[in-house]
Amino acid sequence: GYSFSKNFFSDMGAYAARNGDQNYFSMILFAMSLTIVGITFISYYLLLPGLLGNNRTNYILTWVGTLFAIGGSVCMIGTGFTPSDVVFAPHVFFANNIFHCFLVTALFYTIVIFRSDVLRKRYAIGYAMFFISILTYVIILQYGPSVNSGESALIFQVLSQKIIVIVFCFSVIHQTFGFTKSGILK
């Protein structure tokens, strides 16, 4: 079965479960869910330049952030369609680059929200915290212990991934409240 502390999210999208059983249903749900989330993020970030690009500099910065968000979203979709037990290298490429791309997105949108008068500054602080969280996770990906070096290293990497995904979800919720309170979303 699936272990919260020893299985990455991607293990739900594997072709076969760790015990050798076929994992078709979970694999299909995993791919579909990441596709839906990826398409939703692409749509969301394509709208933001029109909402936050209230001057030339912000408009340019939002588009840079949006381009990286699209890249991260495409990587999210790619992660769903590359089961780790079938095509490991492409899967790792897509999975890691979700966070590399959204790191750049978070940096640019932190700057934009600080510069903009559309959202209150606390939402920029929230985005800055999101940036720091992703940066921490990217550092863990690059320099943290290898999952193959022992059980404690595996647990550390798996729980780090769980934490950043939870932070990602809360960041989206926080931004949604910001746009709702500002009257942009009704």
Predicted features along the sequence, with ranges:
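Extracytosolic (periplasmic/ER-lumenal) interhelical loops and adjacent juxtamembrane/interface segments
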Residues: 1-22
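Alpha-helical transmembrane segments of polytopic membrane proteins
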Residues: 10, 27-35, 92-103, 157-168
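C-terminal ends of transmembrane alpha-helices
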Residues: 14-17, 73-88, 134-151
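Membrane-proximal helix-loop-helix units in multi-pass membrane proteins
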Residues: 68-113
